[in-house]
Structures are given as C-alpha cells and as structure tokens.
C-alpha cells in the first residue's frame, strides 16, 4: 500500500534532497540505521555484525577520506619533516665546519636563485614529454643523494694559536699560520751558558734562521753556526721556563774559503731544534686551517648548485597534482599544506633535542686549548635521508593527468585559482562595459607599467624587503643564538613557536585584512620586524628570544597574504598569475637570496648583533617612508576596491607554494547587491574647515604641528587635482549611465541586460561618484532609480 511505502509520501523537494545526499555519499548512504534499497530485509547476523557506535565512528572519520588527498597530506608531512630537520640547522653546521658568515650565507642564499630558475625548466620538461612522475621521483632522489653528501664532508683542522701576535714581522710564507721572520744572525761562537731565553725574543745575531709555526705552539729553530776548528761548541737546549726537545740534530761540515793569515778556519754546523710550549688557556685560541676551509667550501658549493638544480621542481609538481585532486575545491589546499608545517615543527623539535645529547671529539693540533663542545650533525643527515626516502616512496602513488598539467602554472611557480563563474549572457557582455572586456585589452606591458607605479611599486619593494629579512633570520638567527650559548633544543622550540604563529596568522589573515586593510597590515608587519630585530640584537641570554618568535606569523604570513591579495586586486584574472609570479620571485627568490648572501657579508664585517640592529633600523626607516608615500601619493578610496584574501597558503615554505582562493568583492557579476552606504563621518579637521566662523588657515604654535599641517594641506591639494581629473571624465560615465535610465525624450527602453548590470562598473571609484554628485544632483537610492525607470515608458510615449 501507498501508506506503508515511506518513499511514496516524500515530496519532490525531499526526493531531490535525498538523491543529492545519496550521490554525495561515496559509500551510497551508510547511516546509523541502514535501510535496504528494495523491500529486502537485512539478516539479524549482518545487523549485529557492525555495532551502532562503530558504524557512526566509521562514517564520521573514515568514510569520506579521499585517498588521493591522503597521499598529498602524507607526502607534505614527510617532505617538510625532512626539510625542517636539516635546512634550518645547515648554517650552524657550516659554522662548525669553520666557514665564515659570508661563505655560509652564500651556500644558503644561492639555493633560492637556482630554485627560481630551474623549477620552470623542469616543469616544461615534465609537461612536454608527459613524464611528470619520472621528474618528481628523480628530483626527490637528488634531494637524498646530494644532501647526504654534504653531511660526510671532513671538517677542517683545528689549530691552537696564541692570542697575542708575535713581535717579529712575517714575510712571504706558503702556510697561512707560519711566521717566517727576516734573516737573523747570532755571534759566531755559541757557548753553553745558562742564560735565560724569552719567547721568540732572540738577540739579532748572525747566522740564525728561525721558523716559527704558530698554530702548533711549536718553534723550529735552525741554527747555522761557524765554530772554530779547535773548539767546536756544543748545542744544548735552554731549560729556563721553557722545555725544549731536540727533534733532529744534523751536522753538515763544510770547508770555508781561505782566510787571511791570523784567522782560524771555521766549520758550519746546522742544528734543527723543535720546541713545544704549553701556554695558559686564556692566552691561546682555536683557529681553522683556512686552506682546508676554502677547499671544503668549494666542494659543498658545487654539490649545492648541482643538487638544487635537479631537485628544485619537486614541490611545484606536487602542488600542481594536489590542486588537480582538489578540483573546484581548491580553497582547501591550505588544509593539505598544513600537514607539512606540522611535520616541520615536530621534526625540528625532536632533532634539536636529540642533538643536544650528542658530542664528538675534536683533534686539536697544539697544546693548551680547551676542546670545543661540538655536536654530531651526522644524525641530522641520517634523519633527513630516512624521511626524504619515505617521501620518495609516497610519491610513487601520485596519479598524473597530463591534459591538465599547465606550463603557465609551473613557469610562474604559482597556481592561480579562477574566480567564480560569471552568469552574465553573451549579449550583455557585448553591450555592457564589463571588467572582462576591459581585461582583454590589458596586456603584459600594462601590467609592468602598473607594478612600476608608486602605489604598487612601493608594495613590491616592501615585499622584497620582508623577504630579505626572512632570509636573513632563517640563515643567521640560530648562528647568533649559538654565539650566546644557545642549544639545538632552543632552536627546535623556536621553530615550533614560529610555525604555530604562522598557522594562526594563516587562518586569521583574511579577517585582519578585512578589518584594517592591506596597507595597514604592511605597516604592522614592518613595525613588528623593527621591534623583533632590535630586540634580538640586544639579547644576552639566548632563551629570551622566545617571546619574539610569536611575531613570525605577523612578519611573514600576514605580510604574504596582504601582498598577494593587494596585487591580485589590481590586475584582471588573465594576468593574475603573472603578477603573483613576479611577487613570488621578489619575495621568495630575490628577497630571501639577498637576505642570506648580503646578510652574510654584513655579519662577517660587523657581527651578528650589529647586523640585526642595523636591519631593524632599516625596517623603521622603510616603514616611515612607505607610510609617507601611501599618505601622499595614494588616495584613500583605493582601499575600498581591494580584494579580500581567503585561504592564503601557509607561507613558511622556502620553496614555491600555490596561491589560492582570492575572493573579489567589487567586481562580482552574479547578482547586483543593494548595499546602501551611510555618509562618511567627518573628522574634526573637516568640520573646522567647513565652519564659516573660523579662518581657513590656522597656524599652531608648535613647529611640528605646523609641519604636519603643511603636509596635510599638500595632500589635500593633490587630492583636489585628482578630483578635477575625475570631473573631466565624468560626462562620459554619465552617458553610460543614461543607457540604464534614459531621459524623457529618449524614446528607447533599456534592455534586460542593462537592467541587471552592476552599477559599480560604471562608477569605478567612490571619488568619481562624489564628483558626479557635486556636478549634477545628489545621489538617489537604488529604489528611487527603479521607480524612475518604471516611469520612463510614459515619458517615452510623448
């Protein structure tokens, strides 16, 4: 019967909802009370096999897992776990090998430039030959091989040398730590007297040549004497305050030329004496053999260049495949990439704690120096190799669709998400001046011209400088903390705090941009950078750096989101990938690379603390200049046309990442929105300016107030100039508006496309709207506009 059939009493809407639910469920509708698809009844044994709680848990946690996205999550976790366990510690490892800050900065910074150039090349190769999976696996294999090669480099020799330089002036010498003074001479006859001999302070006698080898605290003295034939002097070591040990003693007699009568003939005796002295520990220091350090530096540089060229494209390819898996739900990319940040933080913390409990014995050439406490960083390379091998195994499960593999995405190293589909018809797009028709005429050179303007060029410069600061911090923060006796456990805690702050800023960056605007977010980022760098420069205890690590999210994640969103709003969707690629190159490529290399040179000459202080002051100067430029040269109304950023990807990755889901507010053509705006609230200054009882110009007694007031007047004059330009263009816009509401004598009715067009397109800025209000009549609400349009047919009949 129909009354017993539960499906028969469902309405059409309920039937449609049920059909959508069944199609959306990947397991065809497993619920808490499963019903058979037909009139069959399940057996009691099958019903009792799966308990109610177990079915509910499976449905919530396991049923809707996408296997493809699970592979991406696991890959990101292992890959960034390997990356985070090794690369933040590489500068400290280079320091332990004896390299200078400039050498370490070059080894770290050159990776960004090679990566920026090689990733597009391998992307084109993978797309052209349809070998994306082969290129991916080969690049991951290069990650393992070339980075493991760095970990097994033999460190340079340590030598113990005195801090006080010797009094003798060095001459040409082949060894950097060998001091060869000028030829000295002693008296022709050396007796076995017991006079004391001070350290390298021999009297200038004829026939003595002394070779001092500083690093070993060892003196090799060669005595060339011309003794008398009858009484050959005996050479004995001096034993007053210094212990001399004769290593080798050889005599090479030779016959001297004939001498005048009355003089005796002499023989030449050469003696090699090596003296070993133990100096107090406060008078000696450890140095590296510079020739060995330079050889190690060149070997690692070649390994880094070759390895980075072959391995730079791995993350770009995986980003592209992951976005293909996501399909139209590409705004969830950040949820996949977040697993990489989780793995980075956990691996860095675990490895840092583990290294603190390892020590290696160092062989020192010389005596008197205290052995340094060196860590065994080979453990880091072993962990890196294991984790990257796991990522390589996971990468074998990726599935590639080559018909969706785009060169443009790899070339720009960005994956740009298209906007919401426009619902306007073809007839409307031909007659209505939409943003799409405008963007077709917007070529690449217009993009370059736009980005070179004062408004957007200043934002690009700030993006480059923030990348410069991030590259410097990534390379030399742990270097500076180790100088303050910081441990690798501290480095791991710093990494966890910075990643937590970046994830937090990632989730709330779009809310912050919506609340205060893009430019003010850049202000806050520059101010936080200033406070952070100056604070680090005055540290005395390494652990006190932790409070400032929470600013990493503001100084990097929020800045990245604001720059991406601000520049994407300025260009049409067709050129948005190019704009984001330029920003990617300036921030992640050129910015970080310059920060590592130029920062290394500055640290080498001025020290880490002074360099942090200098970059902090530079941040303050750039903040003031940027604020002045935005205040004078950029109108306030530009902020109303910005684009809010949703789901900006986690920007802690040092490799290229995708940019996703930029939601545009003002140019949506889906449905016209009726959003009446209240008149802007006037400031106190504007009220005083409009008050007829007060003079138009008032000079304050304070010179600073007068100066600021003069700058404000200059800004108002520049604003008035723009208003005049807008008023000159306004009649053309009025003509386009008349197509929507023609005058009474027009005699033509507006078409359906003009009726539903977005009025915001005909009014590009609130400033132009204000100019039209002052020229014609006050603006009326949208409802009154529609009433006038309804009254047009009667007027058109006349």
UniProtKB/Swiss-Prot annotation:
UniProt region (Disordered), positions on chain: 25-50, 671-696, 732-798
Gene3D superfamilies (UniProt xref): MFS general substrate transporter like domains
Biological process according to GO: antigen processing and presentation of exogenous peptide antigen via MHC class I
Location(s) in or outside the cell: Membrane
UniProt membrane topology term: Multi-pass membrane protein
One GO CC term, this protein: plasma membrane
Main location (coarse class): membrane
Ranges that cross the membrane: 74-94, 106-126, 133-153, 295-315, 344-364, 378-398, 459-479, 488-508, 516-536, 553-573, 588-608, 614-634
Positions of modified residues (Phosphothreonine): 11
Biased composition (Low complexity): 38-50, 760-780
Keyword line: Membrane, Phosphoprotein, Transmembrane, Transmembrane helix
Keyword hit for Ligase: no
Similarity comment: Belongs to the major facilitator superfamily. MFSD6 family.
UniProt-listed PANTHER family: MAJOR FACILITATOR SUPERFAMILY DOMAIN-CONTAINING PROTEIN 6, MAJOR FACILITATOR SUPERFAMILY DOMAIN-CONTAINING PROTEIN 6-LIKE
Name of the protein in its database record: Major facilitator superfamily domain-containing protein 6
Gene: MFSD6
């Amino acid at each position: 019967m129909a009354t017993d059939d539960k499906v028969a009493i469902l309405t059409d809407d309920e039937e449609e909802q049920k059909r959508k639910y069944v199609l959306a469920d990947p397991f065809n509708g497993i619920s808490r009370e499963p019903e058979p698809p037909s009139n069959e009844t399940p057996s009691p044994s099958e019903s009792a096999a799966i308990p109610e709680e177990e079915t509910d848990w499976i449905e919530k946690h396991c049923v809707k897992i996408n296997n493809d996205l699970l592979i991406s999550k696991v890959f990101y976790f292992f890959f960034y776990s390997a990356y985070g366990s090794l690369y933040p510690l590489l500068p400290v490892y280079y320091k332990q090998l004896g390299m200078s800050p400039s050498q370490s900065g070059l080894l770290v910074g050159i990776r960004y430039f090679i990566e920026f150039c090689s990733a597009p090349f391998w992307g084109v190769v993978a797309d052209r030959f349809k070998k994306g999976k082969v290129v991916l696996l080969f690049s991951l294999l290069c990650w393992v091989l070339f980075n493991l090669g760095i970990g097994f480099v033999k460190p340079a020799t340590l030598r113990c040398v005195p801090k006080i330089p010797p009094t003798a002036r060095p001459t040409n010498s082949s060894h950097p730590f060998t001091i060869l003074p000028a030829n000295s001479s002693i008296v022709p006859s050396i007796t076995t007297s017991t006079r004391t001999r001070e350290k390298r302070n021999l009297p200038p006698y004829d026939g003595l040549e002394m070779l001092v080898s500083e690093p070993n605290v060892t003196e090799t003295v060669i005595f060339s004497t011309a003794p008398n034939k009858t009484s050959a002097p005996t050479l004995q070591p001096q034993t007053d305050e210094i212990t001399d040990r004769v290593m080798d003693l050889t005599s090479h007699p030779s016959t001297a030329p004939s001498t005048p009568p009355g003089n005796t003939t002499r023989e030449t005796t050469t003696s090699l004496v090596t003296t070993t002295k133990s100096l107090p520990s406060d008078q000696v220091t450890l140095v590296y053999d510079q020739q060995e350090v330079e050889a190690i530096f060149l070997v690692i540089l070649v390994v880094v260049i070759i390895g980075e060229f072959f391995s730079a494209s791995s993350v770009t390819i995986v980003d592209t495949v992951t976005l293909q898996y996501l399909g139209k739900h590409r705004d969830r990319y950040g949820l996949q990439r977040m697993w990489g940040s989780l793995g980075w933080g956990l691996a860095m913390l675990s490895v840092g704690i583990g290294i603190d409990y390892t020590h290696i014995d160092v062989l020192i050439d010389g005596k008197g120096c205290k052995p340094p406490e060196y860590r065994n960083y080979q453990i880091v390379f072993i962990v890196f190799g294991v984790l990257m091998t796991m990522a390589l195994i996971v990468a074998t499960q990726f599935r590639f669709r080559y018909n969706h593999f785009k060169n443009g995405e790899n070339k720009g190293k960005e994956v740009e998400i298209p906007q919401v589909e426009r619902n306007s018809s073809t007839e409307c797009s031909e007659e209505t001046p939409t943003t799409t028709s405008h963007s077709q005429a917007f070529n690449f050179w217009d993009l370059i011209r736009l980005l070179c303007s004062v408004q957007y060029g200043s934002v690009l410069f700030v993006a480059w400088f923030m990348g410069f600061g991030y590259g410097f911090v990534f390379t030399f923060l742990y270097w500076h903390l180790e100088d303050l006796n910081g441990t690798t456990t501290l480095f791991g805690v710093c990494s966890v705090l910075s990643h937590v702050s970046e994830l937090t800023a990632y989730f709330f960056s779009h809310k912050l941009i919506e609340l205060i605007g893009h430019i003010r977010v850049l202000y806050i980022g520059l101010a936080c950078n200033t406070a952070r760098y100056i604070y680090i420069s005055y540290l005395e205890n390494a652990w006190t750096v932790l409070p400032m690590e929470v600013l990493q999210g503001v100084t990097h994640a929020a800045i990245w989101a604001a720059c991406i969103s601000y520049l994407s709003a300025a260009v049409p969707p067709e050129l948005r990938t190019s704009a984001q690629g330029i920003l990617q190159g300036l921030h992640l490529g050129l910015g970080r690379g310059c920060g590592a290399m130029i920062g290394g040179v500055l640290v080498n000459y001025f020290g880490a603390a002074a360099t942090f202080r200098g970059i902090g002051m530079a941040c303050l100067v750039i903040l003031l200049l940027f604020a002045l430029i935005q205040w004078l040269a950029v109108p306030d109304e530009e902020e109303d046309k910005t684009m809010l950023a949703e789901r900006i990807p986690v920007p802690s990755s040092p490799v290229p990442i995708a940019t996703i889901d930029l939601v545009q507010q003002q140019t949506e053509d889906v449905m016209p929105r009726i959003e009446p705006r209240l008149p802007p609230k006037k400031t106190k200054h504007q009220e005083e300016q409009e008050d007829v009882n007060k003079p138009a110009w008032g000079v304050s007694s304070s010179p600073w107030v007068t100066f600021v007031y003069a700058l404000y007047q200059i800004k108002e004059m520049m604003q008035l100039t723009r208003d005049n330009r807008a008023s000159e263009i306004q009649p053309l816009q009025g003509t386009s508006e008349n197509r929507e509401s023609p005058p009474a004598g027009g005699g033509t009715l507006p078409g359906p496309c003009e009726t539903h067009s977005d009025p915001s397109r005909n009014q590009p800025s609130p400033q132009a709207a204000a100019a039209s209000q002052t020229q014609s009549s006050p603006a009326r609400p949208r409802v009154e506009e529609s009433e006038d349009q309804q009254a047009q047919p009667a007027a058109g009949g006349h």
